[in-house]
Amino acid sequence: ADLKVARAALHMWEEPCISGEAGSGAVFFSGCSVGCVFCQNHAIAAGQSGKRISIERLADIFLELQAKGANNINLVTPEHYAPSIALALDMAKAKGLHLPIICNCSGYSSLTALRILSDHVNVWLPDFKYYSPELSRKYSHAPDYFTVACQALQFMYEQAGDPVFDDSGIIQKGIIVRHLTLPGCMEDSRSVIHYLHETYGDKIYISIMNQFTPVSELLSDYPELNHTISA
């Protein structure tokens, strides 16, 4: 089985405890489990960009990123390739891969895929996009987003436990939940953050992202999203 990869490189713009100074070894897989109307990586998420590679080549890419000094291997939207990625990680580890593995995903993840990856993943980096089913239906075609994301996050927490950092402040295991604030959706953001805090307290980290950038050609039907976040 082959996989479609859009990009593999040192990535300097993740959270500081992921990228550090050396960078995160990010592998961007084509395709995504959720269809957000505002996606800033639309061509990748829709599976339109990328190159077909073998499992063996993916294993080599992991090792090449390690050789370049990456702090970790960062699997971006990996769930739909979970069995193949697990095989590639087995191959790479047999050849000396020893970095923490990050699962960087939408939060709208099947437990089946997460279970396949869980033997390898040290750090879970899920999105938690919505509390409201109305918003998740309207903007991501996923009315059950909150329910699915809650189940996925609970599974991740059972696997990862409390966060651990090395002496350089780079996360080695644990969970960082990302939440992207959307224009006009501040109450929903408050509900998401309240839920996460009430459920997990200080057992997880929350990364609140305010860099929403409208992609105008995708948002002609959603004018309320076609501007940046105001202070």
Residue ranges and their predicted role:
Residues 1, 161-231:
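Auxiliary Fe-S-binding modules of radical SAM enzymes
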Residues 2-124, 132-134:
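Conserved Radical SAM active-site core
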Residues 43-49, 138-143, 221-229:
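Short glycine-enriched, charge-decorated loop/helix-capping segments at active-site entrances
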Residues 45, 82, 107-110, 128-146, ...:
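Conserved radical SAM core fold
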Residues 54-57, 144, 148, 184-188, ...:
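Soluble or luminal CAZymes and related metallo-dependent hydrolases
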Residues 61-64, 91, 155, 159-162, ...:
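A generic secondary-structure signal
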Residues 66-91, 138, 144, 154, ...:
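Conserved glycine-rich "GG(E/T)P / GGGxP" loop and the immediately following alpha-helix
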Residues 137-168:
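Anionic-ligand binding region
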